Amino acid sequence: MTESDTKITLIGSRLAREGLEFIFKGEMPECKKCRLKNTCLNLEPGRRYRVERIRNKDIHECFLHDSGVVAVDVSKAPILTTLESRKAVDGAKIMYEPPKCGKRECEIYEICHPEGLSRGDKCKIVEVLENLDSKCEANYSLKKVKLSW
């Protein structure tokens, strides 16, 4: 991981631990009056990130986090999802398209439509994991994959 792959942001001190993954929700009303908001809000809302390193233990006051916030390096976290089996090739670069399926009761619906990934995102297949054909209620030929975005 290079420094250009990471961003500096602030996170609640109770949450700050290496390896923590989170979905950045964006600006809250309390953020409007904060002098540090530009550092906190430099991530893309709705995306999944991972804390790579805690920069230091200095705690900054925050209107949202009662225990304050600390500076951390974060990177874009890989996302588990499904792809058509014929497109699931290690190292391939793809434009993400979720399966055309409305079967919300399906046991793999959440992984087929993961939070933090959007239709049209340019991604790389980091790893092809398992065949999910038998679990798909729409009878699609699917594989579980790990994507970087």
Curated annotation (Swiss-Prot):
The record's section on InterPro entries has: UPF0179
Write down what this protein is called: UPF0179 protein Mbar_A0292
The record's similarity note reads: Belongs to the UPF0179 family.
What organism does the record attribute this protein to?
Methanosarcina barkeri (strain Fusaro / DSM 804)
